[in-house]
């Protein structure tokens, strides 16, 4: 059996791996803060469970850095604050100020910041929002709350047929935002339908460079193997990768940990591909490859 690993780097100077540009950058910030300030560091994160995976392998947890989604648990007198890669909503930042926490660094992905700024600009200009995104994306409730305060609606569009559910007249102002992990091919089809239905449309393509390059790599890999394994969690990028892979390969599987691998997936397959989602460290992908080798032996 041949095993093919999806490897690429969306940015020069960053070695190929499973991690996206934003997560790689956040990890470097964490390391720098530990080296500079020592222990008693708290990362406020929307997904502390994913941070824990990286911290465990890098030994950061043993060096006094922890991740939490509970601002109340951070001790202002003994811990210093870092915002995680997914950012922190305004109400969390306000709580941190009220507690008197010392903010050492903001590791929010620049593409997430770019998207949030575009959302606010469109709302301030009087637009309702159409967001090309999965409905379960963690940022949707926050955005809906902001829009309600401004008397605007938010419509989530995952596929072409969802455009019919946008309950607005042809000439009402619409601002289109693209979730950072959205697939470009789906974006093109949806936008064609939106522009056909509506006449007053502003578009902010906030898809990140990592998505634009990772998803074509999934397509390339899916076309050349008998089965493909996506190593990631049930979030935007993983779902997009599964969507792309299934368009080109009938044998697509998802794992969240190495123990999820199943021998039945490998039987009769001469070529197997594996690629990590944007928060899957390279060491985890390599462990999965070694497990596949041992299972196929």
Please give the residue ranges for each predicted region.
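The feature marks the mature, well-folded catalytic cores of soluble enzymes
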Residues: 1-297
